[in-house]
Amino acid sequence: MRLLVYNIRYAVGAGMSPQLPVPGAGYLFGNPGTLDNIIEFVKSCRPDVVGLLEVDVGSVRSGGVNQAEAIAGSLGHFSCYECKYGEESLNQVLPILRKQANAFLAAPHILGERFHYFDTGIKRLVIELELDGVVIFLVHLSLKYRHRQFQLRHLYELVSRARKPVIVAGDFNTFWGENEMFLFMKAAGLRSANTGRVPSYPSRIPRLELDFILYGAGIEITGFDVP
C-alpha cells in the first residue's frame, strides 16, 4: 500500500495571499491553476490512499469546486471529508471556513470511516479510515504547544482502541520535531517512517519536521520520501 499525505493549503499556491483575521482560517483568494497542478502531482505518485489537509470542499474561494472530490475523481478513488473545526465551533457556519476540511481518498476497498474531534484547539478533526488490514488516523494538530499535548493524549486513546495495525499521519505542527512526539510514540507503540528525520516545512526550503507518518506493530515500511 502506498500512502501519500499532502497539505494542499486550499490550492491557493505558495505565493503571498491576504489572510482572514481568524487563526487557522486559511486564505481568502483562490488560484484556479493550482488545483490542476496538485492533481497531476498526486496522480504521478500513484497512491493507494491519500490523506489531504487544508482542503476546500466548495467555498467561493474554490469557485464552488470540491477539491477532495475533484482529486478523488482523477484517481478513481472514494473520498470522505469533514470540516476540520469542532462540531460546536462558530467556524462550522461561517462562509469559507465551514468549507475548510481534511479528507481521505482511497480505492473502493474501504470498510468504514469515523470522524472524531479533539476537546481543545481550533483544528479538532481526526479522521479514522478502516481498511482490510490497517486503521489510518489523519490529524492536523494545533499550533499551540499546550493544546497539542492535550490532543496527543486524546489521540493516544483513539489509537489504543484500534484492533488492527495502526498508522497515524498528518501535520503535527511539532516545532521541536520528533523530540516533541517522543512520549506519545513510546506510549502508543509507534515509530516514524521518516527515519532520517527529513524536514518537511516550508515546502520550498524545508527546515522543520512538522509532518509525520507513524506506524505500529504489524506494518513493514518499504520506502519513504519527502518530495
Regions found by a protein language model. Give the residues of each.
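Conserved hydrophobic/aromatic beta-strand scaffold that supports enzyme active sites
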Residues: 5, 102-104, 126-128, 138, ...
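Metal-dependent phosphoester-hydrolase catalytic domains
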Residues: 110, 114-117, 130, 147, ...
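Short aromatic-enriched loop/helix-cap "lid" or pocket-rim segments at secondary-structure transitions
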Residues: 13-19, 64-65, 91-94, 126, ...
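N-terminal, active-site-proximal structural segment of metallo-dependent hydrolase catalytic domains
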Residues: 1-74, 81-89
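Short, flexible loop segments at the rims of nucleotide/cofactor-binding pockets, characterized by
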Residues: 25-31, 115-117, 142-147
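Active-site beta-strand/loop signature of hydrolases that rely on acidic residues for catalysis
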Residues: 2-7, 37-62, 136-139, 155-183, ...
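Short, solvent-exposed loop/turn segments at secondary-structure junctions
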Residues: 8-11, 56-58, 86-87, 108-111, ...
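Structured beta-strand-rich core segments of catalytic domains in phosphoester-bond hydrolases
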Residues: 54-133, 225-227
